[in-house]
Amino acid sequence: MGAWRPMNHLKNTTLAVKTPACRRAACRGFTLVELLVVIAILGILIGLLLPAVQAAREAGRRMSCGNNLHQIGLALLTFHDDHQAFPQGGIEVRLLRLLNGKLRYPNGRQLAWSAYILPYLEEKGLDRQLDFTKAFDSPENAQAGARVIRAYLCPSDGYSSNLVGGLGRTDYGGIYGQRITCANNPPNGCMLYDRPIRILDIPDGTSHTMIVAEDTHTDMQWINALNIFDVSCAINSAPPIENDIVSKHPGGANTLFADGSVHYLSERLDVKVLAALVTRNGGETVGDY
């Protein structure tokens, strides 16, 4: 056993013992200032990202709206193949009477074109429920007329109900003509009351002639031929009481041409160009639009 020696080698050694203050420093959380900075940064990021997310969603809704019109266009063209003409814009059944020795529909504003193409929109069952010898608002057509048809609704319209007066709403109207350059409301479009229009009746060309367009004003029903209109205003500029080309999309509206093509037209489109596009026989030359 060796001699005892003093532990001089530990004389200058300092033991690192954490005090309560050191432990508090190591475990310290966010200060209020730091928390506010983080919240501010998150707010800025959300503010930057939210418009982009909303724009992406609207782009998707606009595409879905265009797809609706594409379906309607195929239905109209198939109807034309079967009947050698597009459907009449509307037929008045209620006021059918003998005029000058012939049966006439003197005020054709009741059963709509959009009711006649139902079989071509995979709605044959609904088509069989309709009584085409009765008016749109007759008791016989009340149940069928209340059906909501998704192909007739723009996903951007934002309405809380898809019914108007108890009948299914539509956001798409047929083109009767234009009052931009012709104030007397001539029937120079493709959707007329009591008169079916053939492709041969469109000398301006089907690819240059609009047949259906968005009209998201609240009063339109797919069974009621009040869903045809003449164009009198620039796109998205008509007052609420006027049926015209109006959408809930920013900057323009979706339109369907008689060849089945769908075009998103800017609300900045010159009204004279718009007037040329909605007439079937104006003889105008239209460039890019």
What would you call each of these model-derived segments?
Residues 3, 21-22, 26, 55, ...:
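Intrinsically disordered, low-complexity sequence elements enriched in Ser/Thr/Gly/Pro
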Residues 1-30, 93-99:
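N-terminal leader/signal peptides at the extreme start of proteins
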Residues 1, 7, 16, 20, ...:
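Generic low-polarity alpha-helical segments
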Residues 26-61, 71:
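N-terminal single-pass transmembrane signal-anchor helix
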